Amino acid sequence: MGHFSSMFNGLARTFSIKRVKNNNGNSDAKEAADDMAKDAKKKELILKSSGYVNAQGSNNSASIFSKRGEKGVNQDCALVWEGFGCQEDMIFCGIFDGHGPWGHYVSKHVRNSMPSSLLCNWQNILAQATLDLEGSNKKLSRFDIWKQSYLKTCATVDQELEHHRKIDAYYSGSTSLTIVRQGDVIYVANVGDSRAVLATVSDEESLVAVQLTLDFKPNLPQEEERILGCQGRVFCLEDEPGVHRVWQPDAKTPGLAMSRAFGDYCIKDYGLVSVPEVTQRHISTKDHFIILASDGIWDVISNQEAVEIVSSTAERPKAAKRLVEQAVRAWKKKRRGISMDDMSVVCLFLHSSSSSSLSQHATTFK
């Protein structure tokens, strides 16, 4: 109990500046979270473009790279926030993959809204849980707090997007794959078909890939059951065998190749949801790094290949870019005649360079 109380008290001091002025509850917490984001951006702790983040004294570092495919504007985007919520032991990472005519606007809106909203909800739920447990012997679960925070955040972001005056998300949407590292635990929240893969040392002392997320495709049994139960349809087109898509009951639209996403309100009544799957994992010294990538990478690169590409990159800042470059080569070789997808990668390194075989140089890709 003492650990969580001190955690809350430290965060509460940061939020209290806004609450001294008035007592508007959630609106104040949201404003404070937005101010934290602005301050972090000034201190170069938030990265939204291709580059590298490594705060002084932090065990975390992250490499980002995004490349436009051959289908038009790049609808992928990413974000890393080191020192998330002014907490030295926290980092937030995310990959957001848009689709549809307004997909690039949707993905950027989700990217920009989610971190502050998540921080606000985490603060409020943590505060309430701390108050509820005062004087009791119940064990406070950090996972339950993060899960509730993510569920509330995703519902809020999707609702805001539906009523956005400048973004038409009726036939457009975005996936979202995010990770929060807090000390020696990571919390993963997945909406869609981007994927997180962990590189860890096996009992045989080799570096192996462990997939941390499910690709939420419409033909997964639990996903298809929900869609069919809501009168939606799931089938492949004749010229795309093996590519299962979600369709409205009486029309050949929209043909969405994932079962969870923000936006896409044309089929929200027919089984598509924006509910995240939230999981946790305790980090050990055997865990080296985590790769977050949009589906364009995984269409042509296996989990193990991705781990080997990143681990063999001498400089951490170049890791994400090198993985994308290898995927571009694989697209040209394996998927000739098919327009290359947008591809984005975040490589989150879990230990300082002094305890890793990968060298580290702070640099930014232009």
Predicted regions and their residues:
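PP2C/PPM-type serine/threonine phosphatase catalytic core
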Residues: 2-366
